[in-house]
Amino acid sequence: SFPTRRSSDLIVVIALFIVWKYYAEALWLFINTALIAGVGNSLLKLFFMRQRPTLEHLVTEHTYSFPSGHAVGSTLFYGTILLILPIFIKNKTVRLCVQILLGIGIFMIGVSRIYLGVHFPSDILGGFCLGLAWLLLSYPIYLEKRFVWRFQSKQR
């Protein structure tokens, strides 16, 4: 319903404001990975132009198959959470449990796309590799920004 959607939007806006105010570098990492996931994946799909599996689909997709956008997106989104988790969860046991669950979630999203018949396993593997590569490139920049922003805030 309309009020539910609007209140959900309001909660997201408030959460983004809090994250921006106190964790700007983490927000930078999320935005960076989201933009790359959207734009980069679309461009790669147009470059490779790989058709989807021809077997019976449980869902209908209208774009090309390689790389899997769900695999890229889940790797980037949940992978980003995995990387910044130490900021938010100090208890090592709880943090490890959450990290394991997020890792299983990333894997299961890939498996579900194969099960639904909309991707080949290589599409999923390519999506995981692309997402992981972008995380490995973005994370050092995030760490540098985090250090600089934390240092600047202590100077004020």
Locate predicted features.
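Interfacial segments of alpha-helical transmembrane regions
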Residues: 12-37
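Hydrophobic alpha-helical transmembrane segments
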Residues: 13-17, 42-51, 69-80
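Membrane-embedded catalytic cores of phosphoryl/pyrophosphoryl-handling enzymes
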Residues: 54-156
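Core hydrophobic alpha-helical membrane-spanning segments
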Residues: 11-15, 104-107
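Transmembrane alpha-helix boundary/anchor motif
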Residues: 21-22, 38-43, 80, 136-137
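Helix-loop junctions at the membrane-solvent interface of multi-pass transporters
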Residues: 19, 47-48, 142-145
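Small-polar-interrupted transmembrane alpha-helices in polytopic inner-membrane proteins
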Residues: 30-50, 98-111
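Short, small-residue-biased leader/transition segments that mark boundaries at the very start
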Residues: 2-7
